[in-house]
Amino acid sequence: SDPSQDFYGSPDPDYLKTTIPLFQKAGLPAQNIQDILQTGIYITNAVKTPKSDYTIERSTIETSLPYLEKELSLFPNTKVIMLMGDVAKKAFNMLTKKATGKNAVPSTSTYKLRTTELYYETIRIIPSYIITGGNILIEKSKAQMASQDITTMLRLIQ
């Protein structure tokens, strides 16, 4: 719950300790968040408050939605949105359901959705795995898939 450990909170935050290696594995020679930003990629959290329990309640996601919605509106030329983890999928579906009456991402496992081309309006949606926290580096198959998904995103934004 230390804000300095968020993506943009300090020069070497905890969140980037797993994120940077995944981007590097995907072919982006990033050393820091600025390198990722220079590529036209903005990383954010779907939930804007620190996690206080193992799971994140729907009400916690709902509290963050206005901030996430405003944040997304700052990027009118977005080509791709990667949803890194189940909470990101839930939050994005809550936003799209509010706007269109339906979910942009089917409630199917990420593993099954990864190869499906999903769109919200003209924006390509790529469901993937959460890229922060030590577990992603332990779960080698998820790290591999997240890296492959980042490669797909990089190809689409070039």
Predicted feature locations:
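Short amphipathic alpha-helical segments
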Residues: 5-7, 93-96
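C-terminal capping/extension of enzyme domains
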Residues: 54-69, 98-158
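Adenosine ribonucleotide-centric catalytic and binding domains
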Residues: 1-37
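Acidic carboxylate-rich catalytic motifs and surrounding loops in phosphoryl-/glycosyl-chemistry enzymes
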Residues: 32-35, 47-48, 129-132
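Short catalytic/ligand-binding loop motif for oxyanion handling, primarily in non-cytosolic enzymes
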Residues: 1-3, 51-52, 88-92, 133-137
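Internal catalytic-core helix/loop-beta-alpha segment
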Residues: 40-86, 90
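Short coil-to-beta-strand
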Residues: 38-44, 123-126
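Membrane-associated lipid acylation/remodeling enzymes share a hydrophobic transmembrane-juxtamembrane segment
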Residues: 77-87, 94-95, 101-112
